[in-house]
């Protein structure tokens, strides 16, 4: 179950303008928010005190005192994702620490919320597939390419595509036995949702790596719901790709274990095929 900070971060887009101001003040400095009075929070967010109370009730708490208690519990858990935005005056030490802390906390949060039964079902879909297409757009496009690099090792027909027209054409000729893995941070990209629906209409299975409750998640046969809180207003998504790549590693590991020890020589052969393309470590010419 997500803690309060994660719930606030995940619902930012659902809040009205005034309530979002309250959320942004809390996420900017949750420690300080636990020390605010309701009047101080309202002033910091430039909203009225009744707006703060409505915000509290929308998250299932009776008022600001209870909200502050849950905030403190979220911070004390040690696993909460706390938004720490990079500021214009951050020095290298500050922004380095923030980026690493954000990635570590987001990975921990994703691990806790990833359903093992859903992971097992996703691995089943991949093992049973005749061929797998990985789709991604924007920041998720290189993740799809990385997936192709991982999963061709399983003696499957695997492809990756970041062009919306190619994605649509492949979905239009999909068949039973085809699996489309669609990767999207928001799950709200119209083209990807349409492709998911088209592929399913033609008998294919669709696995989504995306946000819970999103249009894409609802359009897929199965969706691995990945919480990806991050700063997206100014900076390009960073932690989203790290989590997506890690989840794909989880699925690849699941497939490897399902194939058993008899499959290991095949993987070893692929790895050893690269030896001739690399300089030996002890080569003096490289010193």
Swiss-Prot record:
GO annotations of cellular component type: protein-DNA complex
Keyword Transcription among record annotations: yes
Activity regulation info: Binding of 2-keto-3-deoxy-6-phosphogluconate (KDPG) to HexR releases the repressor from its target sequences.
A molecular function GO annotation: carbohydrate derivative binding
Short name of any one Pfam family annotated for the protein: SIS
Presence of the UniProt keyword Electron transport in the record: no
Protein name in UniProt: HTH-type transcriptional regulator HexR
């Amino acid at each position: 179950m997500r803690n309060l900070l994660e719930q606030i971060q995940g619902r930012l887009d659902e809040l009205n303008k005034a309530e979002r101001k309250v959320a942004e003040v809390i996420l900017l400095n949750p420690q300080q928010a636990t020390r605010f009075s309701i009047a101080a929070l309202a002033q910091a967010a430039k909203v009225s005190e009744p707006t703060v109370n409505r915000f509290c009730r929308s998250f299932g708490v009776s008022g600001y005192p209870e909200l502050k208690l849950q905030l403190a519990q979220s911070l004390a858990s040690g696993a909460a994702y706390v938004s720490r935005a990079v500021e214009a005056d951050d020095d290298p030490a500050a922004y380095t620490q923030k980026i690493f802390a954000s990635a570590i906390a987001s990975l921990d949060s994703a691990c806790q919320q990833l359903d093992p039964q859903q992971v097992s079902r996703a691995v089943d879909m991949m093992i049973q597939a005749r061929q797998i297409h990985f789709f991604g757009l924007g920041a998720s496009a290189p993740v799809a390419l990385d997936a192709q690099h991982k999963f061709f090792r399983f003696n499957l027909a695997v492809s990756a595509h970041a062009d919306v027209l190619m994605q649509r054409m492949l979905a239009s000729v999909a068949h039973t036995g085809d699996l489309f893995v669609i990767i999207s941070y928001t799950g709200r990209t119209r083209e990807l949702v349409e492709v998911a629906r088209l592929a399913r209409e033609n008998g294919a299975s669709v696995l989504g790596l995306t946000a819970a409750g999103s249009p894409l998640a609802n359009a897929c046969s199965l969706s691995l719901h990945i919480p990806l809180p991050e700063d997206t207003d100014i900076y390009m998504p960073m932690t989203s790709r790290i989590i997506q790549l890690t989840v794909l590693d989880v699925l690849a590991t699941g497939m490897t274990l399902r194939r058993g020890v008899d499959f290991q020589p095949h993987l070893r052969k692929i790895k050893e095929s690269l030896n001739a393309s690399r300089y030996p470590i002890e080569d003096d010419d490289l010193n």
